């Protein structure tokens, strides 16, 4: 009987995950994340606000803004506009629009552009599944000069379904990994990213690791505030990293 119940729960979760987008589509929702270094010390926070959702011919366009906060939660004055295209079976991160949303004062006269493959994440995924590689090209221009950087996102795999608990709540998640690498002239860089996404919420936790698998930094969802909420939930203590896979 216990085995049957566990199997039923797994099937229900799989059905729910395939039916819901792996991002928040409720206008007015605020998602607060804390960033930590390798030792678990909080280094900063970000607050993502869902500004609006707009139906288009391509799908649902979700517009958000990401505000940077210091470790105590005080705004630093830096913010970034982002958008995600939610289609029937996947979501596409609008990287080029994100670059255009960077405050011009931070670019020192440079313009940025992104081309290449769509950065998409499907909604229905199975542990062990491999996702297509992504090839991107970042173009940096200033006056009459320009440089292009090729970015490869490879080794994209669905690792597991896990339940993750943070100070924001408990979430059924799909766990993904991918490898980022780029090379320019004699300089190259590579890192790994592991991310947990929850249906209807989006990113719950992510970890950045060296190519050898050593943790460098992490980010975790610590509070959710809906548009009709009176008060924002209390965040976790500033010195702690609270999440863990259950």
Regions found by a protein language model. Name each.
Residues 1-4:
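Positively charged n-region of N-terminal signal peptides that target proteins for export
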Residues 20-89, 95-99, 137-246:
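Acidic, serine/threonine-rich low-complexity disordered tracts
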Residues 90-142:
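Extracellular-facing segments of soluble proteins and assemblies that are Gly/Ser/Thr-biased and enriched
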Residues 6-9:
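Sec-dependent N-terminal signal peptides
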Residues 14-16:
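N-terminal signal peptide c-region/cleavage motif recognized by signal peptidases
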């Amino acid at each position: 009987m216990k085995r049957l119940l566990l199997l039923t729960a797994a099937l229900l979760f799989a059905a729910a995950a395939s039916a819901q987008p792996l991002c928040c589509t409720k206008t007015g929702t605020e998602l607060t994340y804390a960033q930590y270094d390798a030792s678990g010390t909080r280094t900063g926070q970000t607050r993502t606000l869902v500004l609006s959702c707009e139906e288009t011919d391509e799908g649902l366009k979700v517009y958000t803004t990401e505000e940077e906060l210091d470790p105590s939660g005080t705004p630093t004055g830096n913010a970034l506009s982002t958008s995600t295209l939610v289609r029937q079976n996947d979501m596409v991160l609008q990287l080029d629009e994100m670059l255009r949303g960077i405050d011009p004062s931070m670019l020192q006269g440079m313009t940025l552009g992104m081309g290449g493959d769509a950065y998409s994440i499907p909604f229905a995924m199975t542990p062990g599944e491999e996702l297509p590689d992504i090839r991107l090209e970042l173009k940096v221009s200033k006056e009459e000069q320009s440089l292009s950087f090729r970015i490869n996102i490879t080794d994209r795999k669905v690792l597991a379904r896990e339940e993750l608990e943070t100070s924001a709540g408990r979430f059924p998640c799909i766990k993904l990994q991918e490898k980022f690498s780029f090379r320019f002239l004699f300089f190259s860089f590579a890192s790994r990213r592991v991310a947990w996404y929850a249906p209807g919420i989006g990113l719950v936790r992510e970890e950045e690791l060296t190519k050898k698998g050593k943790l460098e930094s992490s980010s975790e969802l610590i509070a959710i505030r809906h548009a009709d909420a009176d008060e924002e939930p209390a965040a976790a203590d500033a010195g702690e990293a609270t999440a863990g896979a259950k």
